[in-house]
Amino acid sequence: MNTKPILALDFPGEKEVFDFLKHFHEPLFVKIGMELYMQEGPDIVRKVKELGHDVFLDLKLHDIPNTVFSAMKGLAKLGVNLVNVHAAGGRPMMEAALEGLEAGTPVGKERPALIAVTQLTSTTEEQMQTEQRIALSLQESVLHYARLTKQAALQGVVCSVHEAKAIAEVCGEDFLRVTPGIRLAGGAAHDQKRIATPDGAKREGSSLIVVGRAVTGAQDPVAAYKIVSELWEA
């Protein structure tokens, strides 16, 4: 698995994506999320892949197992490197997602890695307990979902840096801990509640980090990406 910082292409459309990517003269690991995918469809994935970039397709599927199986079977044909579902969909749904990817991956190609979202990094413990009616601490909920994800034979989870070490202890070092909410020191948190710096995420046990506005909103995105990469790889 590519371990470069994952750049979140959280742009409204194709033009903005390629205006941003033209600044870079190296293969990147990028995230295509719901906003961009819903505007541009699967073609945006194909076009980004044609430029030589690895793609994390961040659609967070959460539906009945049969529907998720069929959706993943289709997504596997796009040649993405990493995809995800919501762990709250349950073990049968996660297993169906994995089966769909295996069924849809073209012969001779590597199946995309599959991970599950535990709790969104925008979710606070109070919000989880009052709105989701989960009578656990936030970390206990995340660890529960991580165990469930591992039982379903997925490759890892999306989590905040605050749970990464505990997940590694429970699920093993090879179990991916993909961490969004990454900011440079002094950067705004925006709508994320549980955030960290790249070097902080490394210390706390993240396997992969997802960086958005710290780079995409920078006056010099290439320089910002270099700083993020150096902090992450130090």
From Swiss-Prot:
Biological process terms from the Gene Ontology for this record are: 'de novo' pyrimidine nucleobase biosynthetic process; 'de novo' UMP biosynthetic process
The record ties this protein, via CDD domains, to:
OMP_decarboxylase_like
Q: Could you tell me the keywords of this UniProt record?
A: Decarboxylase, Lyase, Pyrimidine biosynthesis
State which Enzyme Commission number(s) the record gives: 4.1.1.23
Taken from the UniProt entry, a GO cellular component term is: cytosol
Q: Which reaction does it catalyse?
A: orotidine 5'-phosphate + H(+) = UMP + CO2
Keyword Ion transport among UniProt keywords = no
The record's section on PROSITE patterns has: OMPDECASE (PS00156)
One GO MF term attached to the UniProt entry: orotidine-5'-phosphate decarboxylase activity
InterPro entries in the record, alphabetically? Aldolase_TIM, OMPdecase, OMPdecase_AS, OMPdecase_bac, OMPdeCOase_dom, RibuloseP-bd_barrel
Which positions in this protein are listed as binding substrate? Answer: 10, 31, 58-67, 121, 183, 192, 212-213
Q: Does the keyword Lipoprotein apply?
A: no
Fetch the SUPFAM superfamilies from UniProt. Ribulose-phoshate binding barrel
Q: In which pathway does it act?
A: Pyrimidine metabolism; UMP biosynthesis via de novo pathway; UMP from orotate: step 2/2
SMART domains attached to this UniProt entry = OMPdecase (SM00934)
Q: Where is the active site?
A: K60
**What protein family is recorded?**
Belongs to the OMP decarboxylase family. Type 1 subfamily.
The record describes the protein's role as: Catalyzes the decarboxylation of orotidine 5'-monophosphate (OMP) to uridine 5'-monophosphate (UMP).
Self-association or partners: how does it assemble? Homodimer.
Recorded hits in HAMAP family, A to Z, give: OMPdecase_type1_B
Q: Mind telling me what this protein is named?
A: Orotidine 5'-phosphate decarboxylase
**Which organism does this record belong to?**
Lysinibacillus sphaericus (strain C3-41)
**Taxonomic lineage per UniProt?**
Bacteria, Bacillati, Bacillota, Bacilli, Bacillales
